[in-house]
Amino acid sequence: MIKGTIINKFRGDVKILEPGLKMLEDIIHIPTLGVVPYLHLDVDDEDSLSERFSRRDKAADIDIAVIRLPRISNFTDFNPLEYIDQVSVRYVAAPGQLGKPDLIILPGTKNTMDDLLWMRQNGLEAAVQKHAAAGKPILGVCGGFQMLGRAIRDPLGVEHGGEISGMGLLPLETEFAGEKTRVRAQGVLDTVGGVLSELSGQPFDGYEIHMGRTGTNRNLVHQENVYGTYLHGLFDRQETTRALVRALMRQKGLDPASVQALDMETYKQRQYDLLADGMRQSLNMDEIYKIVEEGL
């Protein structure tokens, strides 16, 4: 049962809207509990509905290219990187957009096999493999991690069915099972070598949510310059974000001393506090509390 309506993200003078609110109430016989203005907040975007995809690149020392998979998910994993002055984060969907980034990230996806086949067909897989052959680092997260292995099998038809070859950049194979892994994870990253060795021992506070098993108990794996993890929220800890960017700067012969990363937990809480304040100021909270107390 609907007890009230709320107008959200309103731009303009609420007084001009008031006659319309009265008309709405007369038509639907449900009270309007408030008009929330458009609030300039920085909160996590919905998957595939982000303005981040269309942002113009900024000039920066470090260029990070995230593959814009058709079924990309959890891409807010990389938001912390965008707050670092020395870093530009781009989302690319074609080989011609890739350029020569300092790091390629393969993000999570709602369908690993179909998105890998998409990369194979449009040439991005070959471009990523060429990047790896040139000694440049690659990081795969969740579904992107699975793509980097030798093979992906789906005997139960969970995603695509059958078996396809992976990119062959990590010595691992993935098999999808009928049960999804959902787990919170805290700790420090396992020891790795190569360009991103500074990630070794860095703290994380994240989660795993994925289909499939990849035959390793490590939270971070690597072979030469290619790295993979199932962890989402990897860069929410500023120490880990800073370690990644400093490693990339050292690879280019740049001084990493000035790299500062945002404390994402504190930053997010500040944004949600601003959202809560905006809601309280805009809504008839007494009426809302009354509805809550009375129940449906």
Located regions from the model:
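Short, flexible coil/turn micro-motifs enriched in small/turn-prone residues
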Residues: 103, 135-139, 161, 223, ...
